[in-house]
A protein has these predicted regions:
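Glycine-rich phosphate-binding loop
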Residues: 48-86
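Glycine/small-residue-rich loop that forms an oxyanion/phosphate-binding "nest" at active or ligand-binding sites
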Residues: 77-102, 106
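N-terminal beta-loop-helix "entrance" segment that forms/cooperates
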Residues: 33-54
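C-terminal binding/interaction regions
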Residues: 8-15, 19-20, 95-164
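Short glycine/serine/threonine-rich phosphate/pyrophosphate-binding segments
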Residues: 13-17, 41-45, 64-73, 92-95, ...
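Acidic, glycine/proline-rich low-complexity segments that act as flexible tails and inter-domain linkers
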Residues: 33, 43, 66, 158-164
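Glycine/charged-rich beta-loop-alpha catalytic/anionic-binding loops adjacent to active sites
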Residues: 2, 29-32, 79-80, 102-110
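Glycine-rich phosphate/diphosphate-binding loop of Rossmann-like nucleotide-binding domains
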Residues: 2-40
């Protein structure tokens, strides 16, 4: 199975990415994770993207807050799918990161999830990999069924409480 390559602009994004890594691990998806900044370590970020395919990566997740140019910088250097994960920073409640991540020029796409949407970034990466992996597709279907069952269990508990 191809790996998911995860890169964050700062270790301050790590709490969000722990959810990403936990979700990938729960689906038995291999991954690697790095801290590379689009602004402070641009050569390392570029090299990571340029070498991702030959290093066994099938999809990339790039997380950053504030100016959040990392996903675009990664996407500019690979034709692998890139998922942008905007993270909340000290101002604007993450809107600056969201807009910086989602507003890409034509020809350099970045699929973008919600601000701090680490779980959905992992699930989107899994869905991309599952296009060519029936076993992974089955795991995703089982997860969806389990999630639905959990919601229905909560509804049943609520209905029982309301009908006392």
């Amino acid at each position: 199975m191809k790996k998911v390559g995860i890169v964050m602009g700062s270790d301050s994004d790590l709490p969000i990415l722990r959810k990403t890594m936990d979700t990938l691990a729960s689906l038995d998806i291999p991954f690697e994770c790095h801290v590379y900044s689009a602004h402070r370590t641009p050569e390392e970020a570029r090299d990571f993207a340029l070498n991702a395919r030959k290093n066994g990566i099938g999809v990339l997740i790039a997380a950053a807050g504030m100016a959040a140019h990392l996903a675009g910088a990664i996407a500019a250097n690979t034709t692998l799918p890139v998922i942008g994960l905007p993270c909340k920073g000290p101002c604007f409640d993450g809107m600056d990161a969201l807009l910086s991540t989602v507003m890409m020029p034509s020809g350099i796409p970045v699929a973008t999830v919600a601000v701090n949407g680490g779980v959905n970034a992992a699930l989107l990466a899994a869905q991309i990999l599952a296009v060519a992996d029936e076993e992974l597709a089955a795991k995703l279907e089982a997860k969806r069924a389990s999630d639905a069952a959990a919601v229905l269990k909560k509804d049943a508990a609520l209905q029982e409480e309301l009908n006392k």
